[in-house]
């Protein structure tokens, strides 16, 4: 009998538990360790921040689902991983031994790397539903006395899509309130160009996003490095290819900036397991090279940047890409418990819907990291409605405890979008 422990119950961790339950033997055990028993659909946080959703709209209690599936569910944070002893230490003083471990912790948010940055400083965040609720309260106060808005992503950030989404959603929300004419907006990003997205673009994301910003009268600064944030003022350096800098002092009445990520403390600083930023190192099978009974999925996985840029830019880990990591990991652990070697490799394909409040952009990147077999993007009102439908669908899937319904698998196969590279062999 094997015991598999999953650290985290977000997008990667919850679906990981469901897929393991399908791939393991009946005698094997699964334990999920998480700080929060409630799953929050993070892609809807921009809507929460303008009052178009509430916490209850985007949440699912995982406890009854895990119980029904026979998955042990520990709602206590992990404090330290001891891989040499196959043990996870928990905040309540207890510990869990494991045969196999899946790190699905998500990231730690590095607000502290910039003075005055983040919810405890002078900028808002939409990384967590708690942040989104605080951002909404601040937005309501802002609307009583409108002024300039600054939105974007800081140096080292890897998740740029939600920053663009939130800029456009704010634009739509302000127009609905008929105060958009009183709000100058600036988009500030560490990307070397608009639409880079940490991926050197997907299809014509550069043209599509530049056009969307222009048509909404949103100015932008690229290759931006934030030096500090004060109350009502953001200090930014625009960095040229040769290293020359141009300073900007941007006044704001409301600011939302996405931070850089790093690995959580419980799995950081472990030789052979994590890189200097605390992200977990994996091979093509999602397996850690130093500790072969440890796997990792999601934002916590170490992926090198696309290349050298004037300001550091990370690579995003998008939803479908994470699901492909999960599927490969579940199959590979299933093989190991049966005495076989892992042979499945995730495709890391990306299928993304970016909502603009009334329109949106969709893109498919196969694989997410270039060079690609498919490199497509499109814009239209249909994307806004597709994002709403996907929110409802995914939350239902989480509540039911289903990793991939048959009709989802069939639809993706029809579109030629696979989670496993092995699925295309032969």
Segments and roles (model prediction):
Residues 2-72, 155-199, 414:
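Beta1-alpha1 glycine-rich phosphate/pyrophosphate-binding loop at the start
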Residues 320-347:
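Internal hydrophobic alpha-helix adjacent to the cofactor/substrate pocket in enzyme cavities
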Residues 110, 118-145, 251-254, 258-324:
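FAD-site-proximal beta/loop scaffold in flavoenzymes
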Residues 68-165, 169-178, 245, 256:
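FAD-binding core/adjacent interface of flavoenzyme oxidoreductases
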Residues 29, 68-84, 88, 96, ...:
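A Rossmann-like FAD-binding core segment of flavoenzymes
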Residues 345-364:
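Flavin (FAD/FMN) cofactor-binding core of flavoprotein oxidoreductases
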């Amino acid at each position: 009998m094997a015991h598999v422990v999953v650290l985290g119950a977000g997008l990667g961790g919850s679906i990981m538990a469901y897929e393991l339950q399908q791939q393991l033997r009946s005698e094997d055990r699964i334990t999920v360790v998480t700080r929060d028993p409630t799953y929050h659909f993070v892609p809807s946080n921009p809507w929460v921040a303008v009052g178009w959703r509430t916490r209850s709209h985007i949440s699912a209690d995982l406890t009854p689902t895990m119980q029904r599936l026979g998955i042990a569910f520990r709602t206590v944070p992990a404090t330290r991983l001891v891989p040499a002893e196959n043990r996870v230490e928990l905040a309540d003083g207890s510990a869990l031994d494991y045969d196999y471990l899946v790190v699905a912790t998500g990231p730690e948010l590095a607000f502290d790397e910039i003075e005055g940055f983040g919810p405890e400083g002078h900028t808002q965040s939409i990384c967590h539903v708690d942040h989104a609720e605080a951002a909404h309260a601040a937005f309501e106060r802002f609307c009583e006395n409108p002024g300039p808005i600054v939105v974007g992503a800081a140096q080292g950030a890897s998740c740029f899509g939600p920053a663009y989404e939130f800029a456009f959603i704010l634009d739509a929300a302000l127009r609905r309130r008929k105060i958009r004419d009183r709000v100058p907006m600036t988009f500030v990003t560490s990307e070397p160009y608009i639409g880079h997205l940490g991926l050197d673009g997907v299809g014509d994301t550069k043209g599509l996003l530049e056009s969307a910003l222009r048509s909404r009268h949103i100015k932008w600064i690229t290759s931006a490095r934030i030096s500090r944030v004060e109350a009502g003022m953001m200090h930014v350096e625009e960095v040229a290819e040769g290293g020359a800098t141009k300073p900007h002092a941007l006044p704001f009445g409301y600011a939302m900036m996405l931070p850089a990520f790093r690995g959580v403390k419980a799995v950081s600083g472990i030789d052979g397991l994590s890189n200097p930023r605390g992200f977990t190192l994996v091979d093509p099978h999602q397996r850690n090279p130093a500790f072969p009974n440890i796997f990792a999925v999601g934002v916590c996985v170490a992926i090198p940047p696309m290349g050298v840029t004037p300001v550091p830019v990370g690579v995003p880990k998008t939803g479908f890409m994470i699901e492909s990591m999960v599927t490969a990991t579940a199959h590979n652990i299933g093989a190991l418990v049966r005495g076989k070697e892992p042979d499945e490799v995730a495709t890391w394909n990306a299928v993304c819907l970016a909502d603009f409040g009334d329109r949106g952009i969709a893109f498919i990147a196969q694989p997410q990291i270039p060079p690609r077999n498919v490199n497509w993007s499109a814009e239209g009102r249909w994307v806004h409605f597709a994002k709403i439908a996907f929110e409802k669908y995914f939350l239902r899937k989480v509540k039911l405890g289903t990793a991939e319904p048959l009709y989802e698998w069939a639809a993706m196969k029809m579109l030629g979008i696979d989670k496993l590279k092995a699925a295309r062999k032969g």
